[in-house]
């Protein structure tokens, strides 16, 4: 799966989850087509935050399907995520989609992939996309060695990822989901 062109980072703290995504859209390996794309958004009655890495068209298809699962299961994030991952893995059309999702309701943070993975990180930090490893490392260091809030951590860690990953820029979208 080719995930070049974006970085999505989410960090959970006592107040909830903050998620950030950069805005760069890259055509192939060399051309930046857009600087301010919105890859993190609020879904399901603005109660769930979700971010995507991968093909934009594929991600929108997955957002639609995921939101339908949330409707079907009354906003139950874990149940909707598991059912979405099952469909994603089994369905011939969905299996070809190249994207990953980070989703949160403020209490639970999950990473979903087309291989059927539904992963809740042990430390409350998750990242996807080409700059994901850089953002993840920076966020974990900031989480362990500072008293910054989740929102401050995602903002600073994404800045570091943007310095290291040519497919990640500093035009961030940040969304917060507070614990219920």
UniProtKB/Swiss-Prot annotation:
<keyword id="KW-0888">Threonine protease</keyword>
<feature type="binding site">
    <location>
        <position position="165"/>
    </location>
    <ligand>
        <name>Na(+)</name>
    </ligand>
</feature>
<dbReference type="GO" id="GO:0004298">
    <property type="term" value="F:threonine-type endopeptidase activity"/>
</dbReference>
<keyword id="KW-0479">Metal-binding</keyword>
<dbReference type="GO" id="GO:0005839">
    <property type="term" value="C:proteasome core complex"/>
</dbReference>
<dbReference type="InterPro" id="IPR022281">
    <property type="entry name" value="ATP-dep_Prtase_HsIV_su"/>
</dbReference>
<dbReference type="GO" id="GO:0046872">
    <property type="term" value="F:metal ion binding"/>
</dbReference>
<dbReference type="InterPro" id="IPR029055">
    <property type="entry name" value="Ntn_hydrolases_N"/>
</dbReference>
<keyword id="KW-0378">Hydrolase</keyword>
<dbReference type="GO" id="GO:0051603">
    <property type="term" value="P:proteolysis involved in protein catabolic process"/>
</dbReference>
<comment type="function">
    <text>Protease subunit of a proteasome-like degradation complex believed to be a general protein degrading machinery.</text>
</comment>
<dbReference type="GO" id="GO:0009376">
    <property type="term" value="C:HslUV protease complex"/>
</dbReference>
<dbReference type="InterPro" id="IPR001353">
    <property type="entry name" value="Proteasome_sua/b"/>
</dbReference>
<comment type="subunit">
    <text>A double ring-shaped homohexamer of HslV is capped on each side by a ring-shaped HslU homohexamer. The assembly of the HslU/HslV complex is dependent on binding of ATP.</text>
</comment>
<keyword id="KW-0021">Allosteric enzyme</keyword>
<dbReference type="InterPro" id="IPR023333">
    <property type="entry name" value="Proteasome_suB-type"/>
</dbReference>
<feature type="active site">
    <location>
        <position position="6"/>
    </location>
</feature>
<dbReference type="Pfam" id="PF00227">
    <property type="entry name" value="Proteasome"/>
</dbReference>
<comment type="similarity">
    <text>Belongs to the peptidase T1B family. HslV subfamily.</text>
</comment>
<feature type="binding site">
    <location>
        <position position="168"/>
    </location>
    <ligand>
        <name>Na(+)</name>
    </ligand>
</feature>
<keyword id="KW-0963">Cytoplasm</keyword>
<keyword id="KW-0645">Protease</keyword>
<protein>
    <recommendedName>
        <fullName>ATP-dependent protease subunit HslV</fullName>
        <ecNumber>3.4.25.2</ecNumber>
    </recommendedName>
</protein>
<feature type="binding site">
    <location>
        <position position="162"/>
    </location>
    <ligand>
        <name>Na(+)</name>
    </ligand>
</feature>
<keyword id="KW-0915">Sodium</keyword>
